[in-house]
Amino acid sequence: MRQTTISKSPRVEVVDALRGFAVLAILLVHHVEHFIYPVYPDPAALPGWLNVLNEGVFTVVFGLFAGKSYSIFALLFGFTFYIQYTNQLAKGKDFSYRFLWRLLLLTLFATLNAAFYPAGDVLLLYAIVGIVLFIVRKWSDKAVLITAILFLLQPVEWYHYIASLFNPDHQLPDLGVGAMYTEMAEHTKRGDLWNFIWQNVTLGQKASLLWAVGAGRYVQTCGLFMLGMLIGRRKLFVPSEANTRFWIKTLIVTAIAFGPLYQIKVLLMDTADSAIVRQTAGVVFDMWQKFAFTFVLVASFVLLYQWEGFKRFTSILRSYGKMSLTNYVSQSFFGALIYFPIGLNLAPYCGYTVSMFIGIAFFFLQVRFCKWWAEHHKHGPLEGIWHKWTWVGSK
């Protein structure tokens, strides 16, 4: 690493707010898509203006946040690893193997989250891919950056695309993801609580992990984790003139890149006749346009956060972000109770617009809980358990 002198890293306010923003964005996406439960009111039974509004809500929420909120979350996961690793190094301790234990604990929270979120959990993916941070923790900045770029290039998809050019019969392996999601929807419709939970933590987790393979999420998450660690090393979230220039340049470059990347994605993924092109080059450009827009969001947020008015406006996101694990898992639990047959079964009565407003209302309830909890506790409920168990056996 570059640093020759190790000092404890202070808490960076913008990171908590940005994490809160990411969890809020995830919440809105989850509510609009009914937590991957595709049951909605019949459009024919709704007034025309509401159908138009519903389509607009879906387009805006998914266009702004789908695939980007998780990317922000992944960046901050890598950043948090750097902070924890550096803080322990400042005390003369090696956090490396404690971090592996922490990842193992994360699988427990992933199971808890998956129990009420059919095939939608991302925490298990993070627990698996997080091992890459352990591997590169002592690498130089240059080595980490080069490796991150290689991952972000989506090499697996390019391999299959190039192979298809030489062999027209080349096909991606059929992982059966579509059939798994169909089966998960049927289990959800049954309304049998214990069957619902069991299928979610078994078949659902399998479907989620295999979906991530086809969507290019594994290698992208590796790259994002490493970029987050580099952001920590370079202290790019700490306010300074140099960092402001960096984020302005990042905003300009990624905003310019997003347009053509998105158009190529439409050509290759949405309208291409060849399935192999859609599943390979199409996926690559889909991930790249999402990556570019992710940094448009991050850079914009960091730059706006230097303005006191924006900082006050987003103050509720800081407390929300400090309890991101609790808020992420609890939204799955309550989402199941709201939309699924095991609970109120409101999915057939809630279109995109109503679902979005339910999500917004639930966000404010979570914020209220976060503020109340923070008055009495240092960590959120799940954060406190994770912290306590992380350091079990330490002196």
Mark where each language-model region is.
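N-terminal signal-anchor module of multipass membrane proteins
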Residues: 2-77
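Functional transmembrane helices that form membrane-embedded active or gating regions
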Residues: 11-18, 22-23, 248-251, 305-334, ...
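Juxtamembrane membrane-water interface segments that cap and precede transmembrane helices
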Residues: 49-63, 193-210, 272-280
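Specific transmembrane alpha-helix
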Residues: 71-86, 122-135, 216-239, 289-308
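Internal alpha-helical transmembrane segments
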Residues: 82-160
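Solvent-exposed interhelical
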Residues: 94, 134-147, 230-252
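Long hydrophobic alpha-helical segments that form multi-pass transmembrane helix bundles
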Residues: 150-229
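Alpha-helical transmembrane segments of multi-pass integral membrane proteins
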Residues: 276-375
